[in-house]
Amino acid sequence: MFKSTAYILNPLFLLLAWCIFFYTQKGLLVWVILSLLSIILTAILTSGYNFWRHKLQWFNFLVIYLGQFTFLLMLKNSTARYLSAIIICFLWAFVWWMLKAYFKNYLTPSQVEYLAFKKYWYVLNLWFFVSSCYSLIIFLSLDFYYLVLLVVLVVFSMAKDLFGTGKNLGWLFWTLSVFFFAQVFAVVYFLPVSFYVAGTLLVLWFYYFITLSLDEKKKVKGPIFIILIATIFLLISSLYIIL
């Protein structure tokens, strides 16, 4: 009974924990630890004996939760915060539901539905995470270089999980990729834009990087053109607002 409803109970618990903390402003560490344990327990119940095969995915899920929580904390409007929390929990329920179907038919040769969705799940939550990191640098004066390292590690972890074992990518590819995203994070940080825009710019290039690598360099011109236009538009609009 509990196993079959775990994908519903976990999002409800996350939402309850967020609402209680936002209302009382107490017990931050306790609620974070309980929520992380809830995610791990749900992952175990959902994946069964395949839990350790997907340990990198579960690590990314924990990072995703921390990024979401930090993002919600930096929202000043209470209505936006609670509404965002509800939407995020609906997404968690959908992810667990898809994972339940994925592991139920684990030996099926093709499980493209969840694997395709996971890319967008990671992209969205990377935006939460990166935007939160930029805000922490600005408002809490956290060390820039440590956060660069943290973002690069998260990008590497998500990309590694998305590529899986099907693509044999050498150390040179990963070294150049890590160096590229470290540069992008640093360059975007020094632009006169909000942390929302900064996070969007980095995530756009992460999406292009993932799409290009997973699609075996097919149909490259379309995505790169759209991302370049979006990058230019975001920069111009942000500078216009500032000036």
Question: Residue locations for each model-derived region?
Answer:
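C-terminal ends of transmembrane helices
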Residues: 40-54, 96-111, 155-167, 208-219
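Hydrophobic alpha-helical segments and helix pairs
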Residues: 64-129
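Alpha-helical transmembrane segments
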Residues: 3-19, 34-39, 57-69, 122-127, ...
